[in-house]
Regions:
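Generic detector of well-ordered alpha-helical packing
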Residues: 4-6, 113, 137, 174
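Conserved non-catalytic scaffold segment of RNase H-like nuclease domains
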Residues: 5-107
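A short, structured active-site edge motif that brings together acidic residues
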Residues: 39-45, 128-144
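Acidic, Mg2+-coordinating catalytic module of metal-dependent nucleases/exonucleases
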Residues: 101-110, 114-115, 119, 153-185
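Active-site-proximal helix-loop-helix substrate-binding element of RNase H-like nuclease domains
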Residues: 49-52, 61-65, 135-175
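Hydrophobic, well-ordered secondary-structure scaffolds
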Residues: 4-12, 160-162, 176
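Short glycine-aspartate micro-motif
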Residues: 1
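Substrate-recognition/cap helix-loop segment adjacent to the acidic, metal-dependent catalytic center
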Residues: 93-96, 111-132
Length: 185
């Protein structure tokens, strides 16, 4: 499962952060186990804007301003740990390769794929996976779950508590999407 947080809805928008979680549909994992398996990367915004002409959308900045302070700190506040975009792409690819390479990558719609692929090309890196490996969570949930509404559904798992999901934190968004695929009703 893959998720990015961005500063726009175009493929050339700044990528703030990304998370990826490997999962196997045969494994019966819980939400906390998914969080533990995640890779989270935060990217340097200034480098993306100044060196690669990535876009910052005013409306998206206004949207971020209305989000919870924790997720704003996680994704928006510059940190010494922010990665050069090329390093972030390499880390994501290394994570994927540690689980056997080109596997199916699930994401919530097409923006995640377009953004990370565009960024990889801009910084001269290989894309994290081939274009045909991407799958859409929303479509799967809408087709497979009787409680589906707008790409979300109820999750039936004894330890899962929806209120523990931190919306717009890419790791939590990934874990929720996996839970819906595995345990959606």
């Amino acid at each position: 499962m893959f998720d990015v947080e961005t500063l726009g809805v175009e493929s050339t928008s700044v990528v703030l952060s990304a998370s990826i979680i490997h999962f196997d549909s045969n494994d019966k994992v819980d939400y906390d186990q998914l969080l533990e398996k995640a890779l989270f990367v935060k990217l340097d915004v200034d480098i993306q804007v100044k060196q690669y002409n990535r876009i910052i959308d005013k409306e998206t900045l206004e949207w971020w301003d209305k989000q919870h302070n924790f997720v704003k700190r996680v994704s928006l506040k510059p940190s010494d740990d922010d990665l050069h975009p090329a390093d972030a792409i390499r880390k994501l690819r290394e994570y994927i390769n540690s689980y056997g390479g080109d596997k199916t990558i699930w994401a919530r719609g097409s923006l995640d794929q377009m953004s990370i692929d565009s960024l990889a090309v801009a910084v001269g890196e290989e894309k994290i996976v081939m274009y045909n490996m991407w799958r859409d969570v929303r479509t799967a949930v809408d087709l497979l779950c009787e409680t589906a509404k707008d790409g979300y559904c109820e999750v039936v798992h004894p330890t899962f508590k929806r209120h523990n999901v931190i919306k717009h934190h890419p790791t939590h968004d990934c874990a929720l999407d996996v839970m819906m695929l595995l345990y959606g009703k």
